[in-house]
Amino acid sequence: MEKIAIIGAGRVGESTAQFLAKNDTCRELVLLDVREGAAEGAALDIQETAPLFGFDTRLKGGTDAAILSGAELVVITAGIPRKPGMSRSDVLDTNVAILDKLVDGIMEHAPDAMLLLVSNPVDVLTYRAWQRTGWPRNRVFGQAGVLDSSRMASFVALETGLSVNDINAMVLGGHGDSMVPMLRYSTINGIPVRHFLSEEAIARIVERTRHGGAEILALKQTSSAYDAPAAAIAAMVDAIALDRKRVLPTVALLEGEYGERDVAMGVPCILGRNGVESVIELPLEPSERKEFDQSLAGVRDDINRLK
């Protein structure tokens, strides 16, 4: 990919830029931030690691949205973060106002770009960006399930003592406490995780996955998680930039899948050069469908606050 932009040079944005640059994911990587010098400093700091890591990506930063011109993919990490005790929905009103201004700038300077939403609450902001741009759903999507699934796989590895390389986990639904860890679709080298874990251990893993971000926030106190979210973003960007056709849980607009429309939710998608190239509709058992619907209801409630 020729050019990628990251809006927000905070911890998640800067860490994402590090991953993308080290992997030579694009030829040009730009960072945009309203804070004077923040994006420029982050870009320069990462650029100076190029001789050590051996990448050729060129980075630059700025405060003017014109820097987005020519970007094929724009990653939005800007917004106010959660503080201890806050839910992702608690930052909704402020982050929607921020998003609206950002989207207007993107539409002016990078009208052909794809948008990858990261700021919380990501399901609602993805819907808002899609609604405001009027772009097709393949071009507007969000990151949540890749991170949640990575957390779940990590906890399975820690609980079993087995290699994380053999573990595949799947988490669907909204990116919040009502997310839906899909145990039936989570395996260790093709074997269902329930073969290796007791129901008590599974319950612990599910609960820890649902509150993974809050756990880190409570421990750090001064910041949310940023390395794992950035790695999740980088995995999605890699799938798109290199047209890998990967199946990854993605916040996507539903157009009849799962019997739903006019809502953005975490569902398995095929990611490639055109963004969300397909939404995969999994058959759900009654208990899974109940959890999915509960998660969906929470997202719809937040979306309805915007209408």
UniProtKB/Swiss-Prot annotation:
GO molecular-function term, one example from the UniProt record: L-lactate dehydrogenase activity
A family per Pfam: Ldh_1_C
Gene3D superfamilies: Lactate dehydrogenase/glycoside hydrolase, family 4, C-terminal, NAD(P)-binding Rossmann-like Domain
The keyword Transcription is assigned to this record: no
Enzyme Commission designation: 1.1.1.37
Residues the record marks as active site: H175 (proton acceptor)
Domain of life: Bacteria
SUPFAM superfamilies with a match to the protein in the record: LDH C-terminal domain-like, NAD(P)-binding Rossmann-fold domains
UniProt xrefs under CDD domains: LDH-like_MDH
Key words, A-Z: NAD, Oxidoreductase, Tricarboxylic acid cycle
Amino-acid positions noted as binding substrate in the UniProt annotation, renumbered to this chain: R82, R88, N120, R151
NCBIfam families the UniProt entry points to: MalateDH_bact (TIGR01763), PRK06223.1 (NF004863)
Family: Belongs to the LDH/MDH superfamily. MDH type 3 family.
Function statement: Catalyzes the reversible oxidation of malate to oxaloacetate.
PANTHER family attached to this UniProt entry: L-2-HYDROXYCARBOXYLATE DEHYDROGENASE (NAD(P)(+)), L-LACTATE DEHYDROGENASE
Protein name (database record): Malate dehydrogenase
